[in-house]
A protein has these predicted regions:
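PRPP-associated nucleotide enzymes
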Residues: 1-104, 108-173
Length: 173
């Protein structure tokens, strides 16, 4: 599924602003205090969404760098794309028990990144308002996994299947 020309390599800012408006419409009554994403391709979407909520964006880093001096919340993500596990970190300075967090990301497939972000929120003692996903690969099960945990997941596009024969088949919303 190639979306790199407008979403996660080159960004069509006008389009992503519209995504942000839609996430705001869906979650505006949730009293969001922070938007959380994971580097790298979720950052642009999260930032343009955050402008409508007027809240900061926190992104989980895939490596702990020397400029993160404070204690951190940590979780492990399995990347099916890169076929490896990696740790993600968020400074305890930027996520705490008073936060009501909206997770924003470009894709949801098997749910590994999303469940790791949920772990960071839980470790901080914060509340999860939900997750806004641009494209959910419903056939990989991550969305149902997270919904079964009681988390509200709003996907702007849900793909039922992808095949050479039928192309991309979207779920009926």
């Amino acid at each position: 599924l190639k979306v790199d020309s407008f979403l996660n390599h080159q960004i069509d800012v006008s389009f992503v602003c519209e995504l942000g408006k839609e996430f705001y419409r869906l979650f505006k009554d949730e009293n969001i205090t922070k938007i959380l994403t994971i580097e790298a391709s979720g950052i642009g979407i999260a930032c343009l969404t955050a402008q409508y909520f007027n809240v900061p964006v926190v992104f989980a880093k895939k490596t702990k760098t020397i400029n993160i001096y404070s204690d951190t919340y940590n979780a492990t993500v399995h990347s099916y794309t890169h076929k490896r596990d990696y740790d993600i970190v968020v400074s305890k300075d930027f996520l705490n028990k008073d936060d009501n967090v909206l997770i924003i990301d470009d894709f949801l497939a098997k749910g590994s990144a999303l469940t790791a972000l949920l772990m960071l929120i839980e470790k901080a003692g914060a509340k999860t308002a939900g997750a806004g996903i641009v494209i959910e690969k419903a056939y990989q099960g991550g969305g149902n996994l997270v919904r079964d945990m009681g988390i509200r997941v709003e996907s702007l596009a849900k793909i039922k299947s992808i095949s050479k024969k039928d192309g991309i088949v979207f779920c009926k919303q």
